Curated annotation (Swiss-Prot):
It comes from Colwellia psychrerythraea (strain 34H / ATCC BAA-681) (Vibrio psychroerythus). May bind 1 zinc ion per subunit. This is Protein translocase subunit SecA. Belongs to the SecA family. It is a peripheral membrane protein. Keywords: ATP-binding, Cell inner membrane, Cell membrane, Cytoplasm, Membrane, Metal-binding, Nucleotide-binding, Protein transport, Translocase, Translocation, Transport, Zinc. PROSITE patterns: SECA, SECA_MOTOR_DEAD.
Amino acid sequence: MFGNLLTKMFGSRNDRLLKQMSKEVTKINALEPVLEALSDEELKAKTTEFKERFTQGETVEQLLVEAFAVVREASKRVFGMRHFDVQMIGGMVLNEGKIAEMRTGEGKTLTATLPSYLNALTDKGVHVITVNDYLATRDADWSRPLFEFLGLTVGCNVAGMTTQDKQAAYQSDITYGTNNEFGFDYLRDNMVFSPQERSQKPLHFAIIDEVDSILIDEARTPLIISGQAEDSSALYKIINTLVPTLEQQEEEDKEGEESTGDFTIDEKAKQVYLTERGQIHIEEIMVEKELLTAGDTLFSAANITLLHHVMAALRAHKLFQKDVDYIVKDDEIVIVDEHTGRTMEGRRWSEGLHQAVEAKEGVNIQNENQTLASITFQNYFRIYEKLSGMTGTADTEAFEFNHIYGLETVIIPTNQPMVRKDLSDLIYLTTEEKFEAILADIQDCVKRGQPVLVGTIAIETSEFLSDFLKKAKIKHKVLNAKFHQQEAEIVADAGKENAVTIATNMAGRGTDIVLGGNLDATIAKLTNPSEDDIAKAKAQWKIDHERVLELGGLHIVATERHESRRIDNQLRGRSGRQGDEGSTRFYLSMEDSLMRIFASERISNMMRKLGMEKGEAIEHPWVTRSIENAQRKVEGRNFDMRKQLLEYDDVANDQRGVIYEQRNELLDNEEIGSVVEAIRSDVINGVIDQHIPRQSLDEMWDIEGLEEQLKGEYATELTIAKWLEDDSKLHEESLREKIITEFEQAYKDKEEAVGVDVLRQFEKAVMLQSLDSHWKEHLSAMDHLRQGIGLRAHAQKNPKQEFKRESFELFTEMLDNLKYDVVGILSKVQIRAESDVEAVEEQHRKSEEVPMDFQHQSASSPSEQAQTPRVGRNEPCPCGSGKKYKQCHGKLA
């Protein structure tokens, strides 16, 4: 109550920020007549003046008023477009490292030019990040004339570019690109072999367009660079034949009763679980197929791989649907993004799930992947010194933006008042009744000529609805993941009179639906148009635009509610841009997945008891409240999942930071002799400690073992036993010093034999090779630890604490193993000439240049391992040498 009273008295924080920024806008507007009087050359010279003032100590904030005024004046001259006052406020919000919520059609692309220009004056680079290559290229091409007029360069960073092209893009003052590509470039830069191969500069300032899509929707799934592991396609095919023989259990087990089915499905968590009966059933079949020996169990450590295969196949068959979660195209499984409805060419689900779906659909099974590098968007974007974003719908997720990223959301008022009519939801008992009502609404719009956009959640629904409209002889266009090549053309026509467009969630997001059709697209279709042709096209567009406004603008028909209110609001936002007329209506049924899984059964029973007739809809506050509660439940669960992923990835992120920092130091330092010397000291002391424990009795010393290890692993032959015979005064400390001195002398002899420069270069090559090899191995170990850590809860242990503890132990062990391997290789290897060093570097380069997959995929699929039993690093080497695997064939030569 007191909070509301204070808000009434002093205004909300949002109101206060807007009021404060409006004062700055007044100052910017006051400069307009002054800048209008300048020539083009004088206006361009302002950029050089601002840069000089920045180097002399003025801050970006002190330059803001003048810089924004210059961009507005340049935009008037280049585009004939003047930034609105609300766009100026949006630019200030972005410059302060906040999120600007701006409604669809309010000119986010033009708004972004203001903070982009201002922050580019620092020469540290500005990244403008969008959701796909088309939008990145479009926005870069559109803004380039403005920035080049002001003396700045613009680059575009999209998939498939060469290293040289990427470096050129990043050297530009302002770089447009996709979130995936910026993230992958960061990972790739930490896998290069020389500083000259890096693309990115230190990450300074980023503006994220559709920030909710990138930082919320895609944040549950990490970016992964992986290489191919070994082939186990035959096993996938065999397991695939087992799944159809299993029966689903509809009800939960009751205490004391046996399972009635082989597996259960949890639709909320999107998981499948084997019952005890299912486990026995599968084990019997596997014994028949000779995958298991009689009496063996699926849950033993040796068979954990088989269990992962079974669970992946179960999920593929029971949870992942064709034309909803993926499509089959050109003998390949192509994932469909659940948030946008777009196909994600080249992306693959991780840890065996994709191969299981390939086996299910009978297409070619591609090899599994091994993780080479990975990062989540949360941790990538938190590297930037300053981060900001724009979207039409951020307010519902404002808490998460603040909690995870420390980003405040500011709601920017619209330039024109919003007049769109958001009609109340209509709820039907069955899907059939719902679609009949949708058809009636579309027919009414068609009769009057009002354009209508029908929003669906899945490709399957859009195709079903398309068939439905064909039977009713209604002309329409379909915009979904299967046809997004024609996306721009379909969106350009969606606002025309009589247009009926069916679209999945993507709904041409990032492209405005203009009432009366897109004028620029119409002019682009003309062949060598004259001034007269363009004038005629503009006049005709004006007539068409006014006509559609008279009809009520764009009408949005939504076929069901999405699990996130934000996605629903995005669909609504397609209509009513810049003060245009428009209307929206959601049609729901009690059979919709959201209602079926989350809405109360009481509502369904209530609707039946009301004795509703077929085709009759219900509009009731109870039902609306129940739907909103259902959406909040899902949003809350998804937030928890993202938060949990971040908590786990924060552990890996600290380790990643250490490794990448060490790697970059290795790359940047010409001479790493002192680093190797410190490592040698650690290793030789560690080896001595194993055989001559500190402050121990002579009887506890293992001199023979020490001599053998030094000779076998470090090619250093020392007669320590003879030293002790010859000198009775040698004690623990003096003996240690003598061993270290002789060990160092042997290395100095090698240095003199091959030359200091050659050895330093070789040290660097070996360090990089060993670091990369151990880090990849560590990532794999972390993946496996992460997949199984949830089971610790059964032992009354906190999985997160256990993960932190064990991952730290793994990391410490990895760093120790790295040191021992590096010293072992450097001690044993015989270097004859500089060509030997080049050969090692080339071998490392080739080992890294395997075909790589760049994935942004599910982090929650079941774990998958290669079929061949993995030899533990501390187990005896299979070659029979008697040494540990890590000290024999487990080591990279």
